[in-house]
Each structure stands twice: as structure tokens, then as C-alpha cells.
Amino acid sequence: IRSIIVSGKGQHIEITADVFIDGTGDGDLGALSGATIEKGNENNVMQPPTLMFNLGGVNFEEFCDFIEQHPEELPYDVLDNIAQGYNADFFRKTKSFIFLGMHHLLEELRKKGECPVDRETVIFIRQPMPGQVAVNTIRLLNFDGSNLHDLSNGEMEAHLQIPKLMKMFRENVPGFENCYLDSINASIGVRE
């Protein structure tokens, strides 16, 4: 790369340099220059991006009671191998935690054709504000973060998944019956 043309505010400016550093996070500079770009794993499958959103109105005590009565909703590898203390007592005592689970709930909803996302678990992060969680459960499959059409379609699809996930939480997860949408992150997060 010997030069690049940047555009903004109605202007096109050519910049020359001995070295360019691509700070886009997506390899845009290399891709646009025709460089070979590696994407995804050995099968060229990329990790799905997500869109984080925050819910308020969550009753954590009711949620902890549910987990205490249904420990099968925690991942087996967590129960057996990773952390024996990852349970309802941990959630009650910890002001901020990452929850990973609900495999059985999603499987039951999938059998009924009511699972709103194609994934195995729900992920949310308890926030410092009372009754708030940041949800990381959106799933966008067959997505290329370097493709403009995928980015546009992904934004739309992610926003369409939010009300479906909220409905799932309200109708199926104790403690979430009165949850409401507090905020949505500005854009989808592309990991690779």
C-alpha cells in the first residue's frame, strides 16, 4: 500500500505513507487493498457477532430461587468441572456476575418451535444498578463483519431478536416477569 484515499465531509483526500496501520478492527485496509485476509476457523466459519442490550425490572431473589430449584439450568461442565460454587448462593452473594445457562429451557422451547435464537445457552451479566442485566444472547449466524450487507442485515436481525428474547424471559424465567428494555448498545459486536 503506497497511498489511500479517505472521504469525509464532501472531500476526498489522498494520503501517502511508507507504512499504514489498519485500526478498523475488521482488516478493512488490507481487504480493500487486495491483501489476502484469513477469516474464521479452518472451515472459514466465523464466530457469531452479538448485540448487547440491558433489561431492568429483574427480581434477582426470584431468579435465584428458580436456579436453586432447577440446578440443571446451569451448564454441566460448570457443575462438574469448573466451579462448584457457581450456584444460587453465589448469585445471591455476588453483586455482579455473569450467568451462563438455561440449556434445558432453550431445548424445551426449541421442541415447541418457540426458541427465539439458535443457541444453547442464555448469557447475561448482572449490573451494578438494582434489577438490571446486560443480555448477551443475540445470535447472528453466517455473518461476515467485513461485508457491508451482512452488517446492515445483522443490525436489523439483532434488533428483531430483542423483543422475542424479552418475551421468552418474561414468560419462562422467574424473576424476569416484569423486565423492561432499558437500553441497546449502539452497534453489533463483531469478534472476528
Give the ranges of each region predicted by the language model.
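A conserved short coil-to-beta-strand element within the FAD-binding core of flavoproteins
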Residues: 1-2
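Core beta-strand elements of the Rossmann-like FAD/NAD(P) dinucleotide-binding domain
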Residues: 7-19, 23-24
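FAD-binding core of FAD-dependent oxidoreductases
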Residues: 24-25, 46
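Mobile, glycine/GP-rich and aromatic-enriched active-site lid/loop segments adjacent to catalytic centers
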Residues: 40-192
